[in-house]
Amino acid sequence: MTGTQDTVLVVVRGPSGAGKSSVAARLRAAYGRGVAVVAQDVLRRTVLRERDLPGGANIGLIDLVARHALDHGFHTVVEGILAAERYGPMLARLAADHRGRSHLYYLDADFDETVRRHATRPQAAEFSPEDMADWYQPHDLLPGGLERVVPQHSTLDETVERILADTRLTPPFRHR
């Protein structure tokens, strides 16, 4: 078991360019201190400099960091492409083991939309639409109906508002 009955786990998955990192950042900004963001790209690409392969070390590291944050009372947002085939079993175990509320989301976006969004990002030069095509998996949902699907027409504000409402993740009272 991991976390407490008071911690909230949010998983935000979807294709490259779907807005996962933006959603995670906005959730943290809305709540303030007390939200840990566990970003697949940071752990896999920056910390480990590992390719996304089946059985990669980053899968266990993502799980470990998320559990550590939950066990220390942080609400936790895990975000990344997190392909169902590779990361699904870990995410299902994490959600099942979590003592608090767990909410999993898939930001659905077709390939053309992900390419359009990618062109507007600061890291647009890091990889090409051809690279994106190699790893794009349409509607890559976790088995068992664990996720709520957020359609591509949902704006960033709408998506964040929906997740905040679903999770009841509201900031603690702050003294002025």
Q: At which residue positions do the language-model features occur?
A:
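Hydrophobic anchor at the beta1->P-loop junction of P-loop NTPases
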Residues: 12
